[in-house]
Amino acid sequence: MKTLIGVCMAAMALIGNGCMGNAKHAETVSGGTTDSLYLLVGSYARAQEEGIRVYVFNQETGKGTFRSGLSGISNPSFLTPSVDGSRVYAVGEDEGISSTANALSFDREKGMLSFINSQPTHGGAPCNITLSPKEDYVLTANYMGGNVTVFPLGSRGELLEGDTLVFTGSGPDKERQSQPHLHCVLFTPDGRLLLANDLGTDRIHAFPVSEKKGEELLDRAASYDVQLAPGAGPRHTCFAPDGKHAYLITELSGDVIVLSYDEMKLDTIQTIKADTLDARGSADIHISPDGNFVYASNRLKGDGIAIFSVNSEDGTLEKAGYQPTGIHPRNFAITPNGKYLLVACRDTNEIQIFARDAETGLLQDTGEKIEMSKPVCLKFVPMDRE
């Protein structure tokens, strides 16, 4: 693999009902409106617990109501939905051979998930999952396995046997970077590259997507690496709405790296601090729907959300503020209308709901929260309309 200088990644997702175990149906919500969404929440939980929960969330009032829960998956810590929301894919984040990827169907009328099938990831601790642009493959980033698994999908959306992409190398941090640690997989907005963030080797592995029918999804021979600063620890990435810039959060150095993206090439144009306390626990990153503000979460010290304004000319960032949160904000999500930012606080067992000022980008705690054990992934899915 040839090496470039730069960086990248992003992500998106949603979810579904039913299970290997059982799905419980709570109260129904009548007459869905354009203000109502499904909020799908992944968590750290035992298989016999409802590790995935479905809520109805009103993005005008900022209030959520429990709809249903799904058991049967151990540690469903990350979810991704199909574009139409009818299918959801979830990791089963165990560290050994029991690690899985799971296919679910989602009944948007009832707000219920049901289990389709499961496949082993052949790599421990899968922590991120994504769908290919044509929604004919699912890929997992396996943190302890140090690899990526590529699953073809069958006609029902079921997972077929997966194939692995194996990586080598290490980084300067002997405790955190003794081997490859894949933390995020996602496709560029134009669908031409798969980007795999490797926290263990300070690289983004980039794979062109094959364009010819009958070929494998990825052109492995044309793959290359984007090399980052030693000890950075790349974690998650998001793209601007126009697809011209990417924003990468590094877990260990606590930076947001701004990259330009053009013709399958990434170039670093700015590095700015999100974690000023050297907590080495930066986690998630998202951009507002209007593209004007970037938000990044920090854990371990000074738990909260760093807020940056975006320069509309060149995509660079300027610090705009900081919002304290509950403990261990591993993941967060912004409502499609941009009015609210929801934070999954793993160690305070709650989803905090913040109102977002569209002019300043700043957040205000509404006092509303959803109590749930160890929430770590939030995805919105539109409700079906009658």
Predicted regions and their residues:
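Bacterial Sec-dependent N-terminal signal peptides
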Residues: 1-36
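An edge-strand/N-cap motif at the start of beta-rich repeat modules
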Residues: 24-58
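Short loop/turn segments immediately following the C-termini of beta-strands
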Residues: 44-46, 93-95, 143, 153, ...
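Beta-rich, blade/repeat-based domains predominating
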Residues: 48, 73-84, 122-133, 137, ...
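Short loop/turn segments immediately following beta-strands, especially the blade-tip
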Residues: 56-62, 104-112, 150-160, 207-217, ...
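Blade-loop segments of beta-propeller domains
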Residues: 65-135
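A short beta-strand motif characteristic of beta-propeller blades
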Residues: 65-71, 114-120, 163, 169-176, ...
